C-alpha cells in the first residue's frame, strides 16, 4: 500500500496564520509537529510504504525541509505548477506508479487533517483494504454526529456483496443548510465526506478514463512531458494548465458504481476553520483556548491566538481573535467560515498579507521584514550553515549589510570576502552580489535596502543552487530572494 499525500491547499480559512506561501498544512497548529509531519508519522506501521507526495511547486523547499527535520522518507514529490484540485493530482500519482509497474493500493490522504485515535484509524483501514482488494473504491466516512453545515455528506446503505463493515454509497449530498443537516443526523446512515480514499491505482485510472477522459488524457500527457530532478517530478506547466479543475468526488466517486464507505470514528478533524482549531484544543474552565501572550478576563468559549504582542480579551463570548505581526482577525465563532471573503478582498486589492508572513522562509533560511518606508526597507536575514543565496543583481536599489552574528561570505562584483560580527558592507545598485554562510552556526545580518523602487520583482538571478533562475520573482512587497 502506498500513501498519496495531497499537500497543495492554501488554507485560506485559517488566515491570517495560514498564508499562500506557507499554508496551514505546514504549520504546527495542534502540537509540536506540523499537520504535514503528523500525517506522515501516522503511517509508520507494517505494510505501509513511503508516501508519494503531491504539492505546489512553490512549497517544495518547505516540504523537503520538514521531511529532513523529522528524518521522514518519501519516494517522490510531484510538483504541481498550480492547483487543479484532487482528481488530477491523484491521476498523475497513479499514472506514475502504474508506468513503473507498481499497481498498488493507494491511500489518498490530505496533508492537513487531524486523527487522534491511531488504533481506530488502522482498524478502519483494514476494513477498507478488504474492499479495495476486490476492486472497490473506498471512501472513509465520518459518522454524522451533529448537524454540521461545513461538510459534504454521504448517504450509505448495506450491500451483501461487500465485506463486513463496508457499505455501498447511495448518494453524495452538497453541504446542507442546518435544517437539512439535522434531518440527516436524525435519520442515520449519513456520513461526513472526509476526503480520504483507498483504491487500486489501475481501478482509479479506469474509472477516471470512463467518467472524465479530459482529465485522464491531459494528466497522461503532462506526466510524459514532466522533468525529473532526483525525487522531484516537475509536472509540465503548459500541458497541466489545460487540465480541468475537478475533485475526486465529482470526477469519479459520484459516477462510479464501485463507490463504498467505511466508517471512521477516530477523532477526525479537517482543521478547516478557526472553530475547528477551538474544537481540537484543551480548554480552560471557561471554555477558552489561548496561545501566546494572552490575558482573558470574564470571557467564555473564545479562541485567542497571540503571536508576539500581548493580547487582552475582556467580556467576550464565542469570539475568535488571531494576532500576527502584520494582521489581526476578529470574528464570531459562527462566522469564521467567512474569513475566505476577507482573503478574496485582500487579494483583489493586491495586498501581500495573504501571500507571506513578515517572516518568510526560503531554502537557504529566512528573513523578517522589520520596517518599511517609501524609499527604504529593513530586513533581519538568517542564513543556515553551509547555505547561500542566489547570485543576483537589482536595478533600482542598493543594500547595506551588517553582520549581527556568525560569518558572512560576501560576493560583490569581482570581489569575495568575509565579514564577522559587527562588520558591514555596501552593495551598490546593479552590482552582482551573493551572500553565503560558510560557518557552522546560523548567520544573522541586518539588511537595509534603499532606492527608488523596492519591489521584489527587481531581482535578476544569475545563478542559483536551488534551481530558481528561470522562475519569476513574486511581485509582492515581502519578496523572494
Curated annotation (Swiss-Prot):
Optimum pH is 7.0 for PMI activity, and 7.6 for GMP activity. Co(2+) (for PMI). Keywords: Alginate biosynthesis, Cobalt, GTP-binding, Isomerase, Multifunctional enzyme, Nucleotide-binding, Nucleotidyltransferase, Transferase. The keyword Repeat does not apply. GO terms for biological process: alginic acid biosynthetic process; GDP-mannose biosynthetic process. It catalyses: D-mannose 6-phosphate = D-fructose 6-phosphate; alpha-D-mannose 1-phosphate + GTP + H(+) = GDP-alpha-D-mannose + diphosphate. Its EC number is 5.3.1.8, 2.7.7.13. Pathway: Nucleotide-sugar biosynthesis; GDP-alpha-D-mannose biosynthesis; GDP-alpha-D-mannose from alpha-D-mannose 1-phosphate (GTP route): step 1/1; Nucleotide-sugar biosynthesis; GDP-alpha-D-mannose biosynthesis; alpha-D-mannose 1-phosphate from D-fructose 6-phosphate: step 1/2. The keyword Transferase applies. Produces a precursor for alginate polymerization. The alginate layer provides a protective barrier against host immune defenses and antibiotics. Belongs to the mannose-6-phosphate isomerase type 2 family. This is Alginate biosynthesis protein AlgA. It comes from Pseudomonas aeruginosa (strain ATCC 15692 / DSM 22644 / CIP 104116 / JCM 14847 / LMG 12228 / 1C / PRS 101 / PAO1). The lineage of its organism: Bacteria, Pseudomonadati, Pseudomonadota, Gammaproteobacteria, Pseudomonadales. The gene is algA.
